[in-house]
Amino acid sequence: MPTALPAWQSLTQHAESIRATHMRDWFAAPDAEERVRAFTLEAAGLTVDYSKNRITPDTLSQLLQLAEEAGVLTLRDAMLRGERINNTEHRAVLHVALRGRAEHDYRADGEPVMPEVLRVRAQMRDFANRVHSGAWTGHSGRRITDVVNIGIGGSDLGPRMVCRALDHLAVPQVRVHFVSNVDGTDLAETLDHLNPDTTLAIVCSKTFTTLETMANAHSMRRWFVDHGVAESQLKHHFVAVSTNREAVVQFGIDPDNMFTFWDWVGGRFSLWSAVGLSIVLAIGPQQFEAMLDGARAMDRHFATAAPRENLPLILGMLSVWYRGFFDAASACTVPYCAPLELLTDFMQQLEMESNGKSVQRNGAAIDTDTGPIVWGTAGTNGQHAYFQLIHQGSQIVPVDFITTLEPVRNLPGHHAKLLANCFAQGEALLLGRTAEEVRAGGVTDEALVPHMVFEGNRPSTTILMERLDAASLGALIACAEHRTFVQGAVWNINSFDQWGVELGKKLAKPIQAELEGAPASVAHDASTVALIRRAKAAL
């Protein structure tokens, strides 16, 4: 139980001792510049300023002591050795191997994994080169111009986010689209703009049984046939990313066009694997390799850096600090970089599916709050939507600001405005505005003064990249993966299963049968019965 650890008890007292301290006092002190230097880290091309957090040097020491007592780095080392740290599914957790090179000796159950990782990576590279060169064609002999990735969850969110983020690096030969929702509108609106003769589908499902993915795959299959593609020619328009060879063949996809991955790859950690085939097609093998390089640099940092210099460790411990000692129920991610607009969607799955747990690894209930709700949008949009709550709401919401020093697209004057707003929001959250400052600003209506006061003392962290390139994005994502791991390790939960996803899927099957006319096979609550009855009348 993490709350029983001596360091947790000490941090509980420490949090009370500094709770009333305003961060503006720390920044008004003569050693403010030293504080910034001490609480700024650089790793794998990222610069992170975490000085605007409600911590002192003693706080950091105690948080790192908690990490030690919780065995965070011991569990990290076990993960890197390929031990089965996913204890509920009896699996290793080796997404770091997906970034590895031939000289790395990653193993699962004692067996080297790099030969297979490199084989699939080469298969992805060769396939992308064939598509880009026009060597791979559709049934009519025309080159492929559009690729549709059909997947959901980890088979969609990561690749979709990366392709959006690196769109400025996209190859000119193909356009990549994503379909995930079982709502037919998602697929139909995508296909409305495509030519079946020049379209390729990637069916991305580990089991090749995922309801949403297979419904969309079968509908896209019908679309091809309805537009004149013979059944025997569908092999020119479908490839699969899966571990289920039998189901892939049964669907009609040539097994030579199947890209595999392994049970030690969790869905939300899988964009580096064959699940990232859409990424390779979108930006090309060279940029994909650069993304792996950036992630590998962060992996090396996480594995070797001393605790006080270990970026993912410290960021993870800050999350534990606010969730466990300041009752922060949510955390906000705000990328001041429009191409990163889908990063928060990715982070939601990464953190909430990993750490949205209420039992420990041994099955016992945990007696502290775990995974915060992750939310946010791209800045500056968020300033005109929800920043009111972050600045003047009744609860603390730690914010991560993420931006680039160089613009992705350089329109005169735009980037300075973007950076100014990013930095100003962090400063405003830090300092706030007192009643005296409001009055000094010319407000004479005393009834208005309380409404214009900002408490400040709201924590934020700023993550800077020199530019948004494949390597820096790889490092950013790997850092997020590792900080998520750190949180789960402290809470003593298994961050690598997702049993909470299963129950709803199981209950949907008999309801679907009833909606399609079958008699009820299971009992439902009265509300669900009424909803089914109403839906059946409309279908």
Curated annotation (Swiss-Prot):
Cellular localization per UniProt: Cytoplasm
Keyword ATP-binding set for record: no
GO molecular-function term, one example from the UniProt record: glucose-6-phosphate isomerase activity
Entry annotation: catalytic residues: E353 (proton donor), H384, K505
Enzyme Commission (EC) number: 5.3.1.9
PROSITE patterns cross-referenced by the UniProt entry: P_GLUCOSE_ISOMERASE_1, P_GLUCOSE_ISOMERASE_2, P_GLUCOSE_ISOMERASE_3
InterPro entries: G6P_Isomerase, G6P_Isomerase_C, Phosphoglucose_isomerase_CS, SIS_dom_sf, SIS_PGI_1, SIS_PGI_2
Pfam family, one: PGI
Biological processes, Gene Ontology terms: gluconeogenesis; glucose 6-phosphate metabolic process; glycolytic process
GO cellular component terms attached to this protein's record: cytosol
Pathway: Carbohydrate biosynthesis; gluconeogenesis; Carbohydrate degradation; glycolysis; D-glyceraldehyde 3-phosphate and glycerone phosphate from D-glucose: step 2/4
Reaction catalyzed: alpha-D-glucose 6-phosphate = beta-D-fructose 6-phosphate
Record flagged with keyword Glycoprotein: no
Enzyme class: isomerase
Keywords: Cytoplasm, Gluconeogenesis, Glycolysis, Isomerase
Family: Belongs to the GPI family.
Official protein name in the record: Glucose-6-phosphate isomerase
